[in-house]
A protein has these predicted regions:
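The serine-hydrolase catalytic nucleophile loop
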Residues: 16-27
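Short beta-strand/loop motif that positions the catalytic acidic residue
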Residues: 199, 205-207, 211
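Catalytic active-site module of serine/aspartate enzymes centered on a nucleophile-bearing elbow/loop
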Residues: 231, 236-283
Length: 283
């Protein structure tokens, strides 16, 4: 059995302008499997002020600085992220390899990657976003989150609705996203897509068949060209927010397997993970 102390740290990056609360429901299982996990909070990306635009290059630079400050050459890590966070994880991994930086990246996990915005819930009006980009309106237009909020489970979805009724921020992130953030996320994915072929470490992709934001067909199109270094797992019981939805337990176990945690591992003390009211409600 592998010594748990030798396992890489799983470094998780949340989705666009959200927070580590997106991982609250998978944290308990990761801890029970003996996985050392931490969350990367990125200035200008984590709970970003939508009135102060930042670019994807700013996000990547800030994330790189956070890695440099936290992890040294003797600390192997696996980078993972949800939605846009997955693209940041892949970009970081290629950056670390290209620049001979001190971290030892052992793998990348992309959860619900948005290689293309082509999910079933998106109407033809989504194409108008490009007009907003072209006219320079991205700074003033916001997009309201709406049902199903990336969640198939009706009980959890109702809880998120109540969170949004009380606040502009919920377990899945802010109630509105600025158009400039969406534009920068698309630019980030355009940067990452060609880099995946040269990704120097194993890639795990977890994606829901019924993802309403990005179709599984689009994800399959990109991962199928990567060969044996990439593994795509299609989840059958969730929408986009797979760390919160019905498949959250499988997501946690797949991540634990990916970092090499023994299946019969006993939990060890870890830094306290964020606990949302949703996590307390579902537990």
């Amino acid at each position: 059995m592998q010594d748990q102390s030798s396992l890489p740290t799983l470094v998780l990056i949340h989705g666009l302008f959200s927070s580590p609360l997106e991982f609250a429901l998978v944290s308990q299982i990761l801890r029970s499997r003996g996985v050392r996990f931490e969350f990367l909070e990125i200035p200008g990306y984590t709970l970003a002020d939508r009135r102060r635009p930042t670019s994807w290059r700013d996000w990547l630079q800030a994330a790189s600085a956070a890695l440099d400050a936290r992890y040294g050459p003797d600390e192997p890590i696996v980078l993972g992220g949800l939605c846009v966070g997955g693209a940041l994880a892949a970009a970081l991994a290629t950056s670390v390899a290209a620049q001979a930086r001190p971290q030892r990246v052992c793998g990348v996990a992309m959860l619900s990657p948005t290689f293309e915005y082509d999910g079933w819930s998106l109407t033809p009006w989504r194409h108008l976003r490009r007009l907003g980009y072209a006219l320079g309106l991205s700074r003033w237009i916001t997009i309201r989150e709406r049902e199903p909020f990336g969640i198939k489970n009706p009980k959890i979805r109702k809880w998120v609705v109540r969170e949004f009724e009380a606040s502009d921020l919920s377990s899945i992130g802010p109630s509105r996203l600025p158009l400039w953030g969406l534009r920068e996320s698309e630019r980030l994915h355009a940067h990452v897509r060609p880099l995946l072929r040269a990704l120097p470490v194993p890639l795990l992709v977890l994606h829901a068949r019924e993802d309403e934001i990005a179709s599984v067909a689009g994800v399959e199109r990109w991962t199928s060209a990567l060969g044996s270094s990439a593994r795509l797992i299609v989840l059958e019981h969730s929408y986009h927010m797979i760390t919160i939805d019905n498949d959250r337990q499988r997501v946690a176990h797949e991540l634990a397997d990916f970092v090499g945690a023994p299946k019969n591992a006993r939990g060890v003390p870890r830094p306290v993970a964020p606990v949302s009211k949703l996590a307390q409600h579902v537990a």
